[in-house]
Amino acid sequence: MRKHSIKTIVGLALILVCTTTGLFAAGAKETSTDPLAQLKAKGKLTVGCKVDVPSFGYKNINTGVIEGFEIDLSKAVAKHIFGDENAVEFTPVTAKTRGPLLDTGELDMVAATFTVTEERKNSWDFSTIYYVDAVAIMVKKDSSFATFKDLDGKTIGVAQSATTKKSLEAGAKDAGITLKYSEYATYPEIKVALDSGRIDAFSVDFAILNGYLEDSCKLLSERFAKQDYGIAVKKGNTALLDAVNSTIADLKKSGELDAMLSKWGLK
C-alpha cells in the first residue's frame, strides 16, 4: 500500500513539475521582449501602406482590394517570417500619419513610398533601398508653363510631411525663383486642386505623379532630389529589420524584385 502511495506521490510530483514548467514557459512566452517573437505570437504582420498611389499601393475601386508593388513586397516579408504571404494586415497611411502609427506600435512596419533621409533615420530604422525615384512636377497641358523657372511666384500643391517641399525649395533657390506652397493630406486632393485651378502645379515623386497623368496634364522635364524608398520599422527593432532586409536581398538575388517592378510598370 505504501509502495502505491509513494508511486502516486511521485506521479503527482511529476505532473506538478511538468505543469509548472509549462506555466513558466507560457509566462516566458507572454512576457518575451523579443519583437520578432512577439510578432510571431501575434500571427500577422501589420503594415502601413498607401492606397492612393497607383503601382505602389492603390485600392482597386472594382474589388476593394489594395494592390501594388509595395503590397507584394510586404507579402513577401510576411512569407519570410510566417511562411504565409497572407499573414499580413494592411492599414492605409499618408505621409503625415505613417510615422506616428509606427511610433505607437499600431504598425509593425511601413511600406509606403517612404523616402529615406538622414533626418528620418533619427526617428525610425530603414531597410535597404528597394526603389529610387526623383521629385517631378505636373501642370495642366494648356498652361503656359514649359520649364521649372516658368513657375516663379506660382503655387505648388504638395503632400503634408513629405520631402517634396524641401526638395523644391532647394531647386527654387538654385534656379533663382520663388514658389508658394499649398499642402494637402492626399494625392487625389492635390490633383483635384490642380484640375480646379486652385494650384498651378502638382509635385511629388515621378512614379507617383505618373499614376495621375491624364491627357489634360503634362510633366515638366526637370527632376529634383533623388528619393530612396525603404521600409521603415520602429527604432531599435533590429530583428524585424533583419527579416525585411533578408527578404529584399533574396528577392534581388532571385530576380523576383525586378519581376515585381516590371509587373507594376516601375521598371
Predicted features and spans:
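Extended ligand-binding regions for polar small-molecule ligands
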Residues: 71-73, 80, 145, 149, ...
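Ligand-binding clefts/hinges and TM-proximal coupling segments of bilobed small-molecule sensing domains
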Residues: 30-34, 40-41, 163-182, 214-223, ...
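Short helix-initiation/N-cap motifs at beta->coil->alpha
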Residues: 88-100, 143, 181-196, 227
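Periplasmic-binding protein-like
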Residues: 51, 131-142, 206-249, 266-267
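Acidic, polar ligand-binding/catalytic clefts
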Residues: 75, 87-150, 216-223
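A ligand-binding cleft/hinge motif common to bilobed small-molecule-binding domains
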Residues: 97, 113-123, 166-172, 192-226
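Short, low-complexity disordered leader/linker segments with a strong preference
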Residues: 1-42
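Extracytoplasmic small-molecule ligand-binding "clamshell" domains
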Residues: 32-33, 40-110
